Amino acid sequence: MNENAPTHKSSHKVKTHTPVSGYHIEDLRTYPTEKLLEIANKLKVENPQEFKRQDLMFEILKTQVTQGGYILFTGILEIMPDGYGFLRGFDGSFSDGHNDTYVSPSQIRRFALRNGDIVTGQVRSPKDQEKYYALLKIEAINYLPSDEIKNRPLFDNLTPLFPDEQIKLEYEPTKVTGRMLDLFSPVGKGQRALIVAPPRTGKTELMKELAQGITSNHPEVELIILLVDERPEEVTDMQRSVKGQVFSSTFDLPANNHIRIAELVLERAKRRVEMGKDVVVLLDSITRLARAYNAVTPSSGKVLSGGVDANALHRPKRFFGAARNIEEGGSLTIIATALIETGSRMDEVIFEEFKGTGNSEIVLARNIADRRIYPAFDILKSGTRKDNILLGKDRLTKVWVLRNVMQQMDDIEALSFVYSKMQQTKDNEEFLNLMNEK
């Protein structure tokens, strides 16, 4: 576990079923240091200005308990191999620290808790020789009373189907990225999509556009952005640009931390899908996640080209393969970036291994980006399997007629043609009608 992982402010709102007095850990995490000092002085904490921020929160909570208050904590459950678990805070990196709450094996068995469950409960402060808070009473699991989730299904037992409901990405007439994707590479609930991206082709901006389109058109969808091995400034930019929850493990952290964060995010998404929710995970990038797995996988003696161990890609494939539309209700959509043309043979091997696993591909082209055309979207190479289910017969026919016309053009001409026509229309319906008249 990495105790030096960066923390981020959480906008997560705690939902409880019983009123509990006092300050909550989640609230304290969001307060500026000046506010924490004000609270500490109010509670008569000795010399609060001498404490670091994390330690000051700890002192406030400890003092609150000694004065008869309660602590209510909501966190994501991470179960350890030995059977006990911890509730991690919504700080964007699930970093472990003194503010985490210990959950005993007996509580996990009694309430049939699973990795990724969001647990709300009353906790007590650490006793002598104890390092963590301890969970006393569970108030809610995944924001529901505990008795309501006892019969929930297991994710792996649910029936996967082809995506049959489109996620609309078009949200503004001038934002043509979502409009193009809606027609030429539509994304449905339960899609397993790859964004194939050479360096500097605008994949980060594309991810922001996807997030904006999803949150604008589908408030019922829970959006999670997972950034693996990214630069810290990219994480901050993403947090400020999108409305979904951003979880990250930056490049200065070890590969084990990348894997831990990714798997906990996936388990959280699965728990929501088990309850019939629609969840979208935007992953940047599947290539770096696979690299992390390759770094920690014990050598099997079978090494593929580029230094990839033959067994290293099984777990990232399981991550990507979790995306599915569920017959019983709910869906898990994963849209992941795959890096190509990086100069690394390992990245090429990873891409080839994932190439056939998705059911949708969004291809970005370096030669288009070099012309300063964004999005650098290769319309001719991008597409979605079974797009007839998502588009409907009438729209599909119009799109295929348009594709046939563009087959006579190169990729830059095709994109420029569509881009210019979309700029003249306010939505895709008007665009298709305009194309139909020509």
From Swiss-Prot:
Keywords: ATP-binding, Helicase, Hydrolase, Nucleotide-binding, RNA-binding, Transcription, Transcription regulation, Transcription termination. Residues 70-145 form the Rho RNA-BD domain. One of its GO terms (biological process) is DNA-templated transcription termination. One of its GO terms (molecular function) is ATP hydrolysis activity. Its EC number is 3.6.4.-. ATP binds at residues 188-193, 200-205, 231. The keyword Disulfide bond does not apply. The keyword Kinase does not apply. PANTHER family: TRANSCRIPTION TERMINATION FACTOR RHO. Facilitates transcription termination by a mechanism that involves Rho binding to the nascent RNA, activation of Rho's RNA-dependent ATPase activity, and release of the mRNA from the DNA template. InterPro entries: AAA+_ATPase (IPR003593), ATPase_F1/V1/A1_a/bsu_nucl-bd (IPR000194), CSD (IPR011129), NA-bd_OB-fold (IPR012340), P-loop_NTPase (IPR027417), Rho-like_N (IPR011112), Rho_factor_ATP-bd (IPR041703), Rho_N_sf (IPR036269). Homohexamer. The homohexamer assembles into an open ring structure. Gene3D superfamilies: 1.10.720.10, Nucleic acid-binding proteins, P-loop containing nucleotide triphosphate hydrolases. Belongs to the Rho family. The gene is rho. This is Transcription termination factor Rho.
